[in-house]
């Protein structure tokens, strides 16, 4: 009788749970059905080579080295690897964007060649005298049109191209499986599993002289990526009831961050060559945070004289501008509402 009552209660609870899952949610007063979880702040995204890039910039700045202008071309994914469910590529398609950030961290002057669609569009309109930098508020009145001047676009001295050329799965793996328990069918049993696997990814880049098309620098690097998985479980019968409890934990080194590390390492070597930097020992003589416009998030050209409060180092601060962490923003929000 007790078993039947327990079964009925479980069935009732399951029905109630399913009905709750299938019910239509009600929007809150804020207008949302659900509040997203997670409050992690936006942070810088450095690799182990980001500090070296910033050091290169400081070296060039201190020694007053005039750096060549760099353009970033197509750094494509040549691995051909795709997700099994067809949801996309295994490897990031944004390697060129990572290279732009890397050369910016090194303080290299950059000219845009990767996406010139907006500039080309406005150049076309300017050529037809349709664009003005001081538009007239009256819609039917003519205005001064933008002039196209000879030589107004700076050219590049070198450009970077290449690709992600290797993605090798499971080049090595190791693990252990253990199972132990009572020999009786209804006795306590347990299992343990541990797995470690290693894969690698490779990059090939080249630096080309824009005027002569000479390839002046070629770099090929690979990086290994490690993953691990640990799980354990217990299986038992207690008073006629079945209990199966399992727990596990796994971690995989970020694949796309490995691509960024490859690009930053290659950029360090290329930039050090262009700057004529002796080697890492030169970083000991310089403050890697000495330039207020270059940091581990990239580089910028200040629009106003406010580098004392807005600079490359403040951009690295994960609490800055965050309504949960920055007291100035929190107080402003409280005062507004």
From Swiss-Prot:
One of its GO terms (biological process) is cell adhesion. Keywords: Activator, Cell adhesion, DNA-binding, Transcription, Transcription regulation. GO terms for cellular component: outer membrane-bounded periplasmic space. Residues 303-337 are annotated as: Disordered. InterPro entries: Curli_assmbl/transp-comp_CsgG (IPR005534), Holdfast_HfaB (IPR049861). Required for the attachment of the holdfast to the cell. May be involved in the positive regulation of hfaC. This is Putative transcription activator protein HfaB. The gene is hfaB.
């Amino acid at each position: 009788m007790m078993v039947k009552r327990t079964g009925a209660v479980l069935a009732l609870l399951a029905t109630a749970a399913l009905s709750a899952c299938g019910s239509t949610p009600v929007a809150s007063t804020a207008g949302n059905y659900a509040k997203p979880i997670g409050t992690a702040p936006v942070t810088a995204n450095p690799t182990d080579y980001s500090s070296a890039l910033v050091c290169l910039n400081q070296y060039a700045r201190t020694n007053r080295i005039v750096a060549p202008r760099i353009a970033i071309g197509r750094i494509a994914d040549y691995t051909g690897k795709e997700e099994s469910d067809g949801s996309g590529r295994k490897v990031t398609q944004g390697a060129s964007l990572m290279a732009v950030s890397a050369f910016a961290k090194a303080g290299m002057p950059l000219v845009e060649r990767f996406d010139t669609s907006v500039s080309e569009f406005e150049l076309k309109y300017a050529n037809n005298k349709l664009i003005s930098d001081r538009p007239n508020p009256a819609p039917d009145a003519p205005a001064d049109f933008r002039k196209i001047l000879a030589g107004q676009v700076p050219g590049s001295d070198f450009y970077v191209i290449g690709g992600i050329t290797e993605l090798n799965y499971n080049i090595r793996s190791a693990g252990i499986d253990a199972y132990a328990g009572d020999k009786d069918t209804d006795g306590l049993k347990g299992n343990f599993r541990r797995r470690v696997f290693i894969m690698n990814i490779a990059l090939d880049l080249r630096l080309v002289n824009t005027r002569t098309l000479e390839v002046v620098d070629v770099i090929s690097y690979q990086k290994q990526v490690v993953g691990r998985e640990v799980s354990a479980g217990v299986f038992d019968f207690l008073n006629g009831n079945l209990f199966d409890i399992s727990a596990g934990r796994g971690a995989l080194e970020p694949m796309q961050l490995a691509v960024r590390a490859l690009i930053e390492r290659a950029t360090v070597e290329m930039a050090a060559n262009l700057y004529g930097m002796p080697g890492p020992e030169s970083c000991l003589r310089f403050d890697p945070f000495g330039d207020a416009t270059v940091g581990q998030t990239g580089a910028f050209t200040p629009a106003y004289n406010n580098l004392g409060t807005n600079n490359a180092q403040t951009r690295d601060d994960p609490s800055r501008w965050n309504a949960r962490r920055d007291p100035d923003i929190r107080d402003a929000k409280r005062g507004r509402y």
